[in-house]
């Protein structure tokens, strides 16, 4: 059942998962929000109970946001940074915090609120939880990435992560620096009780995600090595998944529901 209004009955006995979508680009507004099949796996948890608390799912659309420097078209080789103002990612963090406050004001205990996101939404989840984990129960970052298909474009499987980042910094020095700044800020967290799902064949940050393991509290899970999970072929709808970046939206990913519920 879909409730388009922000209504939570018996809020003290609810667990709220806030679902954040990916982005078509890093900093500009977009016409799209959630794609087909995006909800299926998290929606499969709705109405299940954990310690007599019922799970609900809230889909937060922030696709219309744009960063303060978006008009400057800063994704270019001669942009040196630093970024002036708030990025779209920062504004998405703020939107989540506003929603969290509304839910808490309605009576939902803060530790029963969880933030999750895919791709740029997963990157944003890391940004939010690293600074505001006191306001929620935890987070789930799914194939987190927001700076392009770095792993594929720069052939990470052949040259290694360090060489990929060197080439990226040479081509887009300011952009690469902005990514590094965000990673450094996320790594400042002293305890980050979140799940971080990655896949080695993800064309975005598939082989560039080891840094997240340095953060205390993070449980990194490598989804699979291929396009099966526990012997089950991964599909989105009726189509086989061929892009590992989308494997967290495939039916096979529900294998991890018990892990998520923990």
Model-identified regions with their sequence ranges:
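Primarily recognizes the serine-hydrolase "nucleophile elbow" in alpha/beta-hydrolase
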Residues: 102-105, 111-159
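Conserved alpha/beta-hydrolase
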Residues: 47-74
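The feature captures the conserved acid-bearing segment of alpha/beta-hydrolase catalytic domains
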Residues: 146-224
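Short, surface-exposed "cap/lid" segments of acyl-processing enzymes
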Residues: 6-49
């Amino acid at each position: 059942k879909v409730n388009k209004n922000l209504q939570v009955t018996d809020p003290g006995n609810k667990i709220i998962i806030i679902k954040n979508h990916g982005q078509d680009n890093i900093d500009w507004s977009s016409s799209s929000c959630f794609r087909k099949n995006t909800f299926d796996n998290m929606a499969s948890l709705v109405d299940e109970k954990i310690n007599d608390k019922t799970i609900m799912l809230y889909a937060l659309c922030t696709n219309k946001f744009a960063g303060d420097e978006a008009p400057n078209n800063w994704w270019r080789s001669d942009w040196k940074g630093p970024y002036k103002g708030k990025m779209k990612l920062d504004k998405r963090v703020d939107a989540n915090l506003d929603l969290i406050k509304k839910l808490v004001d309605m009576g939902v205990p803060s530790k029963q609120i969880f933030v999750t996101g895919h791709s740029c939404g997963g990157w944003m989840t890391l940004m939010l939880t690293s600074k505001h984990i006191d306001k929620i129960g935890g987070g789930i970052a799914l194939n987190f990435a927001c700076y392009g298909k770095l792993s594929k474009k720069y052939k990470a499987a052949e040259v290694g992560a360090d060489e990929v980042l060197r080439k990226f910094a040479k081509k887009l020095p300011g952009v690469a620096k902005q990514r590094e700044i965000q990673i450094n800020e996320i790594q400042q967290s002293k305890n980050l009780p979140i799940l971080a799902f990655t896949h080695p064949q993800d064309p975005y940050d598939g082989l560039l995600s080891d840094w997240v393991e340095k953060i205390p509290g993070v449980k990194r899970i490598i989804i699979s090595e291929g396009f099966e999970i526990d012997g089950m072929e991964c599909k989105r709808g009726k189509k086989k998944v061929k892009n590992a970046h989308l494997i967290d939206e495939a039916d096979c990913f529900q294998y991890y529901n018990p892990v998520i519920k923990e």
